[in-house]
Swiss-Prot record:
<feature type="glycosylation site" description="N-linked (GlcNAc...) asparagine">
    <location>
        <position position="386"/>
    </location>
</feature>
<keyword id="KW-0472">Membrane</keyword>
<keyword id="KW-0325">Glycoprotein</keyword>
<dbReference type="GO" id="GO:0005793">
    <property type="term" value="C:endoplasmic reticulum-Golgi intermediate compartment"/>
</dbReference>
<comment type="subunit">
    <text>Homooligomer. Interacts with DRGX. Interacts with BMP2 and BMP4. Interacts with the BMP type I receptors ACVR1, BMPR1A and BMPR1B and with the BMP type II receptor ACVR2B. The functional complex with its receptor NEO1/neogenin appears to be a heterotetramer with a 2:2 stoichiometry, RGM molecules acting as staples that bring two NEO1 receptors together without interacting themselves, this arrangement leads to activation of downstream signaling via RhoA.</text>
</comment>
<feature type="disulfide bond">
    <location>
        <begin position="142"/>
        <end position="229"/>
    </location>
</feature>
<dbReference type="InterPro" id="IPR040287">
    <property type="entry name" value="RGM"/>
</dbReference>
<keyword id="KW-1003">Cell membrane</keyword>
<dbReference type="GO" id="GO:0045893">
    <property type="term" value="P:positive regulation of DNA-templated transcription"/>
</dbReference>
<dbReference type="Pfam" id="PF06534">
    <property type="entry name" value="RGM_C"/>
</dbReference>
<keyword id="KW-1015">Disulfide bond</keyword>
<dbReference type="GO" id="GO:0005886">
    <property type="term" value="C:plasma membrane"/>
</dbReference>
<dbReference type="GO" id="GO:0098552">
    <property type="term" value="C:side of membrane"/>
</dbReference>
<comment type="similarity">
    <text>Belongs to the repulsive guidance molecule (RGM) family.</text>
</comment>
<keyword id="KW-0068">Autocatalytic cleavage</keyword>
<feature type="glycosylation site" description="N-linked (GlcNAc...) asparagine">
    <location>
        <position position="123"/>
    </location>
</feature>
<dbReference type="GO" id="GO:0030509">
    <property type="term" value="P:BMP signaling pathway"/>
</dbReference>
Amino acid sequence: MGVRAAPSCAAAPAAAGAEQSRRPGLWPPSPPPPLLLLLLLSLGLLHAGDCQQPTQCRIQKCTTDFVALTAHLNSAADGFDSEFCKALRAYAGCTQRTSKACRGNLVYHSAVLGISDLMSQRNCSKDGPTSSTNPEVTHDPCNYHSHGGVREHGGGDQRPPNYLFCGLFGDPHLRTFKDHFQTCKVEGAWPLIDNNYLSVQVTNVPVVPGSSATATNKVTIIFKAQHECTDQKVYQAVTDDLPAAFVDGTTSGGDGDVKSLHIVEKESGRYVEMHARYIGTTVFVRQLGRYLTLAIRMPEDLAMSYEESQDLQLCVNGCPMSECIDDGQGQVSAILGHSLPHTTSVQAWPGYTLETASTQCHEKMPVKDIYFQSCVFDLLTTGDANFTAAAHSALEDVEALHPRKERWHIFPSSCGGCRDLPVGLGLTCLILIMFL
């Protein structure tokens, strides 16, 4: 009497890979390690008839629940780690409850190893809250990604929100929500963002006497109140005073164990992060040398939620033409505060030449993009080596917060106007004109 062979699993890797490609937000963006690949093979993403498990072993039910809990998550969004860890703990608990029935089952043991590997990768604690196995009926009103982060489009499809990035650093250099890059004067107080959810204002002061170049020495951020989530919170930083708390002395907003708004001090007096779950927004503030830098990621639908009277927002519309340094006209005069013809040789800041400035910037930024050009520009116009670190940190913030990797680097190619071009192409011209 012959023994009937079990159904073949030879197609499992292809099936698992195809399913993974249809779920871009399920796993972290880094390449999966071998254990994670093994988990993918065991996830129960296969058709019911491909690899039958004994009826008493419920590993496929555990896996199906885990997929349902994580399919809507966006790895680039605030709160991803917390929600992913909750789902992993729920998955681990489910496997423990079915462990006796699954003893000796390869799929079960692969899943257990994969869960352990993922929990280690994401720094998940074994103890803590777990996700509900009915995620469709659980909504956190103070988590943007729970109540508003997934939008319905035509045909009933759901897509994650579109994020925007804005950054300000150096003399100052502005990267707008549209990825336009500008070098501006904007001396005094100016609004970067002023919408229905968030207000950000910076104050800029002259860097070098007699020059139009300025840099930021004060940042004020207002997280506006939202019912049930947080009271209004104000954060203010000035040179040599970068607090790890709001002006009222608190470090968070909202009730419960998971705060809807909180501050994380990354480097004492030098670098803080603010995470606002209720509006899906992240803000980085740094001090490098005597000046501050700022980087912000915010959902597009919230960033564009403002009244007509709030249209003066540098992150939205860029600097006014009158405030642009790289305006394509009289650039040397704009930078150095002198009235010089373009044929006159203009000296850079003592101690720096184009070659030495380029060498110093290249050590931090091997890619000669607009951040490298900004670094060279700042060294030549101020002589302050701290601006090298500012440009490098600004690029790191882009890589941490900007949602589209292909747009991290911006490359100047020709001279042109501040408002008309998507990037500060005039910056290259400014550097070259100084050495004509």
